[in-house]
Amino acid sequence: MGTATFSEAVLKNLIQHDYNIVQVVSQPDRRVGRKKELKMPEVKVVALEHDIPVFQPQRIKDDYQAIIDMQPDLIITAAYGQMIPQEVLDCPRLGCINVHASLLPKYRGGAPVHYAILNGDEKTGVTIMYMVKKMDAGNIIYQKETPISNDETVGELYDRLSILGAEAIIEAMPAIIEGTNESIPQDESKVTYSPVISREQEKIDFNKPAVEVYNHVRGLNPWPGAYTTYQGKTVKIYQGLVHNCP
């Protein structure tokens, strides 16, 4: 289950390692761009290339029977974008697992890659975890770390974490299937959140220290893009440089 590039990488790796994918669930096709052309989610494109059935409910909480009817042994989600109903979580005999782009319990939520750079973190990673009703709160199965360079953008880090997540799920799968994996509860005292970036957050505050402004710019590059205003017009800024003034 997934929609974005992150889930595309996971699906491709599962296919390459000969796992039997009985169904792919993604968000509906969306109209994008000035011409409002209908675009399929990346994960759907991969599924169709490999003759895998695709299910695209508008709202999964109201339309999930097709998933249960497949009687899956295991459900894997990666950047799906909707909360999964309990009926689906209870369906597979091996459980539902999620590939999350942070080192949980840090950065639960929908924008973990953005916040890692916005906050100037020196490392991040991916987490394979069991899914529960509460968002990103399940037991941790497997984690994989990676450093963050001080000039990396959110787009660049997202691409790297997509690959890392695809590697991590393959490394974790044998123990999950055999039932020999050991999962550990998350430390609730260390939980932080990464809510979706709001329009207000996109605006640059030049009263902040230069390093924070720099992190803000690269933490929103290429999407949604940091901005300021100049002569009454909105100006997007995608690059910055910190100078050490004498």
Where in this protein do the model-derived segments appear?
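One-carbon transfer enzymes
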Residues: 1-224
